[in-house]
Amino acid sequence: QTLKEHPEMSSMKETAERFFDVCDTGKGWDACQQFCHADASFSAQAGALADVNTLQEYADWMKGLLTPVPDGQCEVRSFAVDEDRNNVTAYAVFRGTHTGEGGPVPPTGKQIEADYVYVMQFEGPKISHLTKIWNDGISLQQLGWA
């Protein structure tokens, strides 16, 4: 099966890629909302994100992360469409250095290199839920925040 035979796969992948690009470069909900349902939910088994329940909150959390880590960048390692389950999975690595103000402690100069995965669930052409799989404890230790 090819993307030409299944245009919905291409559309889902394109939407997910465009969402990922604006979300993980810190553009916030204003840039992300066009790819998501207004009430899109969010979940993660990570203490740092315990109070984040909507995709709007998460997009703005990512925007806020780039204040203390202004050089933060993501390297996508894998992007996969699961047509049967109506979702797209992205595996990436986030790298950056805590040089900016606004973190839980003054700038540490320490670097983060964090693996993480998004599973973006679709309803129709837009994202309805995002699950983030991430070991926040290691990331917080790397930055000197824990």
Question: Can you describe what each PLM-predicted range is?
Answer:
Residues 2-146:
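C-terminal and inter-domain tail/linker signature
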